[in-house]
Amino acid sequence: MPFSYLIEKDDETYLVPGVNLRSVGTIRDAQKWPKRDKRTDQQRLDMINYNLLSPYTIYKMMKAVGILKNLQELVGETSEVYYYQNTRIKGSSLRTALNLYGMAINKFLGNSLIKRLEGTDFRSMEEVWSQLKPTSSAGRGEWLDLSGLILPREELDGLIEKVEEGKITSLEAIEEFFAAMHSNYYDMEWTWAYDMLEEYYGVNLSSISAAQIVDLVRRWQDSVIGLDNLLYKDAKKEFSLTFMTGFGVDGSDKEKQEDFEGVRGAFESNPFVTAVKEHIVVKRALGDELIERMERLF
């Protein structure tokens, strides 16, 4: 199950599914790798996709949700402990995981929908339906992480088949395939998201109403802002007294805090914290803008 902790306690292994989705450390990791990529060549040999949420990770979350819901059905929703592959999952952890995975899935699918509909002043729902149609036939089914290149399994299987049949015989042709997969990522991602939006929310995107789109956007807003608020709370822990050990050793708690802020800065002015707060404002405005465009079509 993605974004999980494994904890050993009293000779028992506890699985805490999805908990890292609300962790500051996860977001910092996702942000640091693109910053460390100092390649300057226009033609890059390694195709690396840095997206934290992608068909690859969201597919894993959807599978995890299915497993967790199945455990609830088998054992009961009020159980204090669930057992999965030689690990224990606390009932509270399972319920939290379903909530976190749900928010992350809403966030990704909503991002895809909003991106698809951005920048167009629609005059009719027919125009909306037309813009929602996928432009790539590739992208359906399971996706893989191939050393940083995120691509559909079906496309990779097709490459392997062509190599085995002798239709592809050079490294240059394979490199061209990888480059094409990387450059066409967002088209293929939308093909996948299109299917998942229909399956997950039970909507028909070829005839979806403006009101249904507004409902999906509001669900996306709630999830994005909800996850950001959880990150905000997690960041606040790093400014608690327990994190101030070694600061103002001989002083009072007040002096310890002043020493800590002198080195690390105040919580509200911390760059990560200000970025989270700005992200909430930007995403709320982005959702409101699409809602306004859709409400004209009611």
Predicted feature locations:
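Glycine-rich hexapeptide-repeat left-handed beta-helix
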Residues: 1-76
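Intrinsic-disorder/low-complexity loop/linker signature
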Residues: 11-12, 86, 166
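Short, flexible coil/linker elements and helix-boundary hinge sites characteristic
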Residues: 51, 66, 76, 110, ...
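An accessory alpha-helical subdomain
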Residues: 60, 65-125, 131-135
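Charge-rich, solvent-exposed alpha-helical interaction surfaces
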Residues: 64-70, 74, 97, 116, ...
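Short, amphipathic C-terminal "tail helix"
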Residues: 99, 129-134, 138-141, 277, ...
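Charged, long alpha-helical assembly modules
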Residues: 124-126, 130-196, 209
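Charge-dense, extended regions
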Residues: 175-298
